[in-house]
A protein has these predicted regions:
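Solvent-exposed, charged/polar functional surfaces in cytosolic regulatory/catalytic domains
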Residues: 40-43, 47, 111, 115-122, ...
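Short, charged, low-complexity loops and linkers
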Residues: 18-32
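Helix-adjacent hinge/juxtasegments
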Residues: 80-124
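Acidic catalytic patch
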Residues: 122-138
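Short, contiguous alpha-helical
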Residues: 2-7, 12, 31-45, 52-95, ...
Length: 193
């Protein structure tokens, strides 16, 4: 695995890590990571066979198409949620949207990514420290600084589902892309800034 220590040791990264950032360093750090990870996520989504969009590993699991469509829309959805100081919790029991095709999933990903790229730079570091709450029945399910909210619910949430999709691909007999190291099917990819 190749890592970019230059970026990890950059002045902007040090300011973000120490909590002494100014301007929109937090948004830029999140956006830099998002842009790098977008390529890998797209690679995973492109591998889903059209004929397997309705496949699921278990009755309680999302179909491959539902999972992929969710992954495509997480970036814009979470970014939108982060703009308000308080939002109602989504209905976790609502039916998941089905994807009609891999092309539809990739188009949704492109639109979602465009929204993130347009919106994140408008959130300055002061706003990144403000609290975002997700509330259900008068109780805060989530109460985090906006930057932490975005890190957790946009990026970490995305990686969680990408890992799920990797298992789906393996069980479908599809070659799994490398991510941070070899996948069993591919050597590690090179990570760069």
């Amino acid at each position: 695995m190749t890592t970019n220590t230059k970026e990890a040791n950059s002045p902007a990264a040090e300011r973000v890590a120490s909590g002494h950032s100014s301007g929109n360093a937090v948004a830029q750090a999140l956006l830099d990571e998002f842009n790098r990870e977008l390529l890998t996520t797209r690679d995973f989504l492109e591998r889903i066979p059209e004929s397997q969009l309705n496949w699921r590993p278990h009755d309680k699991s999302m179909t491959a198409g539902q999972l992929a469509f969710h992954m495509a829309n997480v970036p814009a959805g979470v970014t939108r949620l982060s703009l308000a100081d308080e939002s109602p919790a989504p209905d976790f029991n609502a039916a998941r949207q089905e994807a009609g095709s891999v092309h539809e999933i990739l188009d949704s990903l492109d639109q979602s990514a465009a929204y993130v790229r347009q919106t994140l730079p408008t959130i300055d570091d002061e706003r990144m420290r403000d609290t975002v709450k997700i509330v259900k029945d008068g109780r805060a399910l989530i109460s985090l600084p906006r930057g932490v909210f975005l890190r957790s619910l946009l990026l970490n949430h995305w990686y969680h589902h990408r890992g799920q999709l990797g298992v789906y691909l393996r069980l479908m007999g599809v070659s799994v892309p490398s991510c941070y190291g070899p996948s069993g099917d591919e050597p590690p990819r090179t990570l760069t800034a």
